Amino acid sequence: MLRITATQIDEMIAHVRAEAPNEGCGMLGGTDGSVLAVFPARNAAASPIRFTIHPEDLLHIVRTVEYERDWQILGIFHSHIASPAYPSATDVAEAEFDMGDGELAERYPGAVHVVISLANPAEPDVRGYTIRQREIGAVPLQVVPDTV
């Protein structure tokens, strides 16, 4: 389960809408399964059907999350412009890499893959998944109150 606020979901949706017609992307930082900050990123692929977090943004986010704040990368988010909020074959293929011996390793170990569908722009659909060994598993997103 990933705990996230409605405000953070709205931040992700606003970012991916602003990136349309290309996929939008970013990362989620926090601790103990609770998102503490949303980190929008540029899509280096500049594509409506795939995303790659821009290397400069990735470096900045990882430094901020892991070194400055002592948090973890809890999730990676991206949009699907015209398809459901479910990992595509490309998403699955790019979530892991071959270690050279046929063993697959996650690019972002333990991170939840959050997919935001903009197929119905008035009602974006936001869902979470794990992708491990090319298998997709649903991860509940628990919407929690904003802290003051």
Q: Predicted segment positions?
A:
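Conserved, mostly hydrophobic/aromatic
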Residues: I76
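Conserved beta-strand-loop surface patch within small alpha/beta domains used
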Residues: M1-I73, I81-V148
